[in-house]
């Protein structure tokens, strides 16, 4: 079937979105490379935000001065930036693969607006725009770190986390209910069936980034709050654990209540949350200023509670996943054939209909003989 006018318009719009996506990825990559050289317009390197040697857990914030708070150190920030670039690269490659398979195929399909359906399921123009926003906000986040502006660092970390969250939700749900998403999957072009597995990998990879960004946004919010209000540094360190726990629990519950219906294999956020916990441990273990004071007990208990929450939700996800795989074949077998009661009811209805037709034929014969 020839592509319709709607297919042509949507394909062109989607293609333009992918072109802008590639340009944005190149822009962010160049920015990250150049930001390692302070003399090229950046006041400082982005990965050196806090001097942990000057951190004092018992001190209060001094207005108009930079107060060191709990944040990622230089090695962690470089690894974080490199990993985020790899995630952006993987998502960009995914969109390019989908574009090639949808735009360059010779068999356009037998359904009306087939390309529009395929684009809508694999990642439409709005989802591509959300991904562009995620890359742009990440670029602005690293830019604010190079200027060492606590308030802007906290703001851009929250905006980037929000954009990445919306992009992940759109990739998982396609803005539809589960039944409608299943209907669109059944109408997908046969040549895109294998790409769905690639899409599942991308969803989990984005969720890994989202899980680690939970730690980053918790640190950034408390870092900005601690540099703008008269609070003690030790209290802000403990507040990082509270913010992290609240955000991670909300996401764990959303995965178990809603998102698991759309994508069965969802362990990306759990893996990213684990890496985030390790990211919290590293600066605290590395620098003695965190543990050589009265906050040692509170920090230890906070770590224990966070790991317990993570282990509980990860175990729940694993149990539900493997239990769903074990019962999947029974569900499909039940849908394959009709039940015995339905077959018996249909047979009884057919026999009654046949008897009624025979009686009418006999009556007609009798009337004809009388005539």
From Swiss-Prot:
<protein>
    <recommendedName>
        <fullName>Envelope glycoprotein M</fullName>
    </recommendedName>
</protein>
<dbReference type="GO" id="GO:0055036">
    <property type="term" value="C:virion membrane"/>
</dbReference>
<keyword id="KW-1015">Disulfide bond</keyword>
<feature type="transmembrane region" description="Helical">
    <location>
        <begin position="152"/>
        <end position="172"/>
    </location>
</feature>
<feature type="transmembrane region" description="Helical">
    <location>
        <begin position="240"/>
        <end position="260"/>
    </location>
</feature>
<feature type="topological domain" description="Virion surface">
    <location>
        <begin position="148"/>
        <end position="151"/>
    </location>
</feature>
<keyword id="KW-1048">Host nucleus</keyword>
<keyword id="KW-0472">Membrane</keyword>
<keyword id="KW-0325">Glycoprotein</keyword>
<keyword id="KW-1039">Host endosome</keyword>
<feature type="transmembrane region" description="Helical">
    <location>
        <begin position="299"/>
        <end position="319"/>
    </location>
</feature>
<dbReference type="Pfam" id="PF01528">
    <property type="entry name" value="Herpes_glycop"/>
</dbReference>
<keyword id="KW-0946">Virion</keyword>
<keyword id="KW-0812">Transmembrane</keyword>
<feature type="region of interest" description="Disordered">
    <location>
        <begin position="346"/>
        <end position="371"/>
    </location>
</feature>
<feature type="compositionally biased region" description="Basic and acidic residues">
    <location>
        <begin position="347"/>
        <end position="359"/>
    </location>
</feature>
<feature type="transmembrane region" description="Helical">
    <location>
        <begin position="80"/>
        <end position="100"/>
    </location>
</feature>
<dbReference type="GO" id="GO:0044177">
    <property type="term" value="C:host cell Golgi apparatus"/>
</dbReference>
<feature type="transmembrane region" description="Helical">
    <location>
        <begin position="14"/>
        <end position="34"/>
    </location>
</feature>
<dbReference type="GO" id="GO:0044175">
    <property type="term" value="C:host cell endosome membrane"/>
</dbReference>
<feature type="topological domain" description="Virion surface">
    <location>
        <begin position="286"/>
        <end position="298"/>
    </location>
</feature>
<comment type="similarity">
    <text>Belongs to the herpesviridae glycoprotein M family.</text>
</comment>
<feature type="transmembrane region" description="Helical">
    <location>
        <begin position="201"/>
        <end position="221"/>
    </location>
</feature>
<dbReference type="GO" id="GO:0019031">
    <property type="term" value="C:viral envelope"/>
</dbReference>
<dbReference type="GO" id="GO:0005886">
    <property type="term" value="C:plasma membrane"/>
</dbReference>
<feature type="topological domain" description="Intravirion">
    <location>
        <begin position="173"/>
        <end position="200"/>
    </location>
</feature>
<feature type="transmembrane region" description="Helical">
    <location>
        <begin position="265"/>
        <end position="285"/>
    </location>
</feature>
<keyword id="KW-0261">Viral envelope protein</keyword>
<feature type="topological domain" description="Intravirion">
    <location>
        <begin position="101"/>
        <end position="126"/>
    </location>
</feature>
<keyword id="KW-1133">Transmembrane helix</keyword>
<comment type="function">
    <text>Envelope glycoprotein important for virion assembly and egress. Plays a role in the correct incorporation of gH-gL into virion membrane. Directs the glycoprotein N (gN) to the host trans-Golgi network.</text>
</comment>
<feature type="compositionally biased region" description="Acidic residues">
    <location>
        <begin position="360"/>
        <end position="371"/>
    </location>
</feature>
<feature type="topological domain" description="Virion surface">
    <location>
        <begin position="35"/>
        <end position="79"/>
    </location>
</feature>
<feature type="topological domain" description="Intravirion">
    <location>
        <begin position="1"/>
        <end position="13"/>
    </location>
</feature>
<feature type="topological domain" description="Intravirion">
    <location>
        <begin position="261"/>
        <end position="264"/>
    </location>
</feature>
<dbReference type="GO" id="GO:0044201">
    <property type="term" value="C:host cell nuclear inner membrane"/>
</dbReference>
<keyword id="KW-1040">Host Golgi apparatus</keyword>
<feature type="transmembrane region" description="Helical">
    <location>
        <begin position="127"/>
        <end position="147"/>
    </location>
</feature>
<feature type="topological domain" description="Intravirion">
    <location>
        <begin position="320"/>
        <end position="371"/>
    </location>
</feature>
<dbReference type="InterPro" id="IPR000785">
    <property type="entry name" value="Herpes_glycop_M"/>
</dbReference>
<feature type="topological domain" description="Virion surface">
    <location>
        <begin position="222"/>
        <end position="239"/>
    </location>
</feature>
<keyword id="KW-1043">Host membrane</keyword>
